[in-house]
Amino acid sequence: MSQHFPCYSAVFPLLLRERNGKREVLLHRRHNTGYMDGKWDIAGSGHVDEGETARQALARECSEELGICVRPEDAEFAHVCHRLGKEGDRTYYDLYFFVHAYEGTPAIMEPDKCDGLNWFALDALPEDMIDFRRLHLHQVLNGEVYDELF
């Protein structure tokens, strides 16, 4: 008989803007987290906590990590990746959402976990971005709604 395993969920708010004729995405650089430190990642991402929906988690994470207010109804589902854990890593459902509106100016609110915050043109993403986040971002922008990594 197969054994059920714990499966975690994480949310990824896609904050996009137009600047100088280029579309940009907001990324943060991970620091002192124990996971992919020094790599650029989707800004405001985080775990879904017990008892909250994915959109509620996204609003909470944006407030905690970026200091901005996102209403859950301003987050539009875009993509999910079922990411199977390897060698003891956790299995995740990564949920990506377009954020259509927010209040405030994004800032680093958790300097113990993040040491960089910047807008990057979609055609000039940093080389040291987490590889599979780059892949997912391109999939989202191409209208792909589901992926699996194993």
Regions inferred by a protein language model and the residue ranges of each:
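Conserved Nudix-box catalytic region and its N-terminal flanking loop in Nudix hydrolases
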Residues: 22-64
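A short coil-to-beta-strand element that immediately follows conserved catalytic motifs
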Residues: 69-79
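Short connector loops at helix/strand junctions that flank enzyme active sites
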Residues: 8, 37-43, 72, 90-94
